[in-house]
Amino acid sequence: MVQQKALHGPQSFSEILFSLRFIVCQFLGEGAATWDEFKKTSGVVLTTDYSGIGSAEIACAFIVEALRHLGHLSTTQAASFVLCWRACELVGSCRSVLADHHDAFAPKHIMGDLLDRLPACVKTSLSSLYKKHLNAFTKAWAHAAGAKKGNKSLQSSESSKGAKAKAKSKAKAKAKTAHAQPRKKASPGPLRPNLSRADLVKTHGQASLQEAWAEVQKKAPIQTAHCFRCDGMCAVPPPSDVRANHRYINVSGNTCVPWSMLGSKFGWLHECTIVMLAWLWSLVKALPECIIEECTPRFDWEAFQDLLSKWYVVQSLVYSPCQMGIPVKRQRRYTICIRKDTLVFSIPWSITTMQDNFWRSLDITARVFFRAPKSYLKLV
């Protein structure tokens, strides 16, 4: 099958701003059944975690604007189509930016620490559990590293012995003894099979993840937390009357430090996994129709999928804005989780679908983001 040529991407900064119109238009063709489901509702209730400065909320504003521009929402409908119920961000300066949002896409509630959703006894248990598994990994890695060092020393020693043996071969050939010398024993093999750090991180990390997930489910998550916008205790999940006749979607971007090339590479053994489990368990109890999770490409989405398999269909893709014609080389893994008992999102989520319907040629460079005159840019 011959692959169709990608459509031309944005040609200017203004076209980048409105490129979501193209994406929404394509989606309404490929995902018509999904849009038909949405039209039966009053709209979307959105919550975000690891919220940063509100990128998901801003993206929602662009999507709704595109729907209005394309005639699928009236101006009145667009004003209330998305209700941003809650954001959650640990960093105070980011919360200040979130609090400055005052349009229709400003979160009604702004919360802080995701760990506030776990009872104190669960946090204590998880902390002890992760220390146990981290210590086990540390010992295993020290043993493996020591074995490798021993093997290298042994190989070096054998190599040195071999060189000396060659140097003395002539003398040994001439030497005659009355009795044969006893044969030396063969040198021992490796002290243990070679194990990489990545192998040990994966083995111990997945063991700790499964044990921690079982532990976190022993207690219900806390349903309220301090709200920095209201200065009081507010509901973490949107209440049933707010969700009525709406589709509930959560968009979050987990901490990338354990998974990125420049991060710790501790995977599930990193302490922030406890935070991730607090986030995930609170969502499982609320059961949004869709969870969209963003992280770096090395994120272990298959283990993540195993945690959610009882409730969600989970799929994952890696791509960057460059594939949509936007000159931002920021490859990320996007994992989408659709609730099994609703399955309201019928659009096929595959690399082929994305390529056929959303990929566009990259026709501009990052210079498009500069505001300097073109005459100056030519000199750069």
What residue spans do the PLM features occupy?
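S-adenosyl-L-methionine
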Residues: 1-96
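Active-site loop signature of alpha/beta-hydrolase-fold enzymes
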Residues: 56, 93, 117, 257-259
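Alpha-helical structural signal in soluble globular domains
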Residues: 59-66, 101, 282, 306-311
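Intrinsically disordered, low-complexity, charge-biased tails
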Residues: 78-79, 168-174
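Short, conserved SAM-binding/catalytic segment
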Residues: 99-108
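Conserved residues in the N-terminal Rossmann fold of short-chain dehydrogenase/reductase
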Residues: 111
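Conserved phosphate-binding loops in nucleotide/dinucleotide-binding enzymes
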Residues: 114
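Class I S-adenosyl-L-methionine
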Residues: 120-165, 173-248, 253-380
